Amino acid sequence: MRACIACGCGLPEQPLMTLDHMPASAQNIPDGETVAADEGITLNLCQCPSCGLVQFDCEPVDYYRDVIRAGGFSTTMVELRRRQYRHLIETWHLEGKKFVEVGCGRGEFLSVLTEFPVSASGIEHKEDLVKIARENGLQVTRGFAETEETVFPDGPYDVFLSFNFLEHQPEPGVMLRCIRRNLREGGMGLITVPSLEYILQYDGYYELIHDHIAYYTFETLENLLTANGFEVLEREMVNRDTLSVIVRRTEGELAEEKSPAGELPAGGGAAPGSRRPAPVDVSGLAASRRYIDEEVNGLVDRLHSQGKTLAIWGASHQGFTLAATTRLGGKVSYIIDSAPFKQGRFAPASHLPIVAPEHFFQEPADAILIVAPGYTEEIASIIRERFGKQVEILALKSNHMETLR
């Protein structure tokens, strides 16, 4: 029996949901030499009976310490970060303070922070990303919150940032306690994670991916933060699908409670004596998976009967999961993505080739299905402007497809 990554309680034998033919990863994308050995995997989605955290009962991907972003420089994300930084700094009077982004990747969001009157630095585990960030003039060091005692260079800091990183961590409590030790008294933070509420509300089963080992709600995220020495000052849903919280370090020693399983937790969970969490209902996810499978394959059949072709736009975890679970390998021409490091590779499990947008002019597709929640309108505008009016544009919207043109 595996234990909860947040509180150490034993996970139930019966999962909430079993997903087969899932991509093994969203970032270690197969190339021409490795694609033949790549295959889909089975994942069990479970809920901790003590703290309520929904999670996969498996080992994390081997690159969970690294931050690899494809959409960091999109207009949507840059404007969101700019708004978040402005609010954080102005509301909490953080001008002139020392900020550190924990898991900063190439510095996509750190570069936006340099527009503001603060000291901006970052920590990143992946060496080649550290090099790129430094070449771009950013103050980034190589490191990771490996243990509670890990010391960040040039600390302590006044404010930390963590963008969609915590959900990858197999020991989220260790990471949070490490960050807390590297903050000054009263230090603050801004954290974002994908929202389980969003996934359940819109039955977006394609949001589930091996890379994201945990799926937080505001409640389970706040429980985790409280148990590891932070109080939540503000919380907000951003971009429809992401939880965003502003936190402050609490003072005093952190208690280390025994879990119901009798094990020391990896970093706290439900408070002793608190009520058991309500079971999460994932029946909508299972129904959505069946319906979307029928809808997408119905689209493929219609186009093929007319002698037409289909491409997907979005080599993200959503696109990978959709293509794999609906078994689109060999039925779709290619997946378009603007990230150069993905181009020339193959989608995990489905093995669809990933190409640059310019590939369309060499091999036009009659229809394009956008699978990139949060970026749909931005991508649709690009298709209209660059590919002409003859292309049929569709998008995955929540639990169904929608024709945009």
Question: What spans do the regions from the language model cover?
Answer:
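General small-molecule cofactor/ligand-binding pocket signal
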Residues: Q14, T141, L233, V355, ...
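Conserved catalytic loop of SAM-dependent methyltransferase domains
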Residues: T18-A24, E207, E236-L254
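Short, hinge-like loop/turn segments at secondary-structure boundaries
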Residues: L138-R142, E207-H210, G252, G329-G330, ...
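N-terminal juxtadomain amphipathic helix
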Residues: M1-T76, E236
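Fe-S ferredoxin-like electron-transfer domains
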Residues: L43-F116, S121
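Acceptor-substrate binding/catalytic loop of class I
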Residues: G32, A37, G204-E219
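Conserved SAM-binding loop
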Residues: R86-D203, Y215-L233, V247-R249, T321, ...
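Hydrophobic, well-ordered beta-alpha structural blocks that scaffold small-molecule cofactor pockets
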Residues: H87-L88, I246-A261, P265-R405
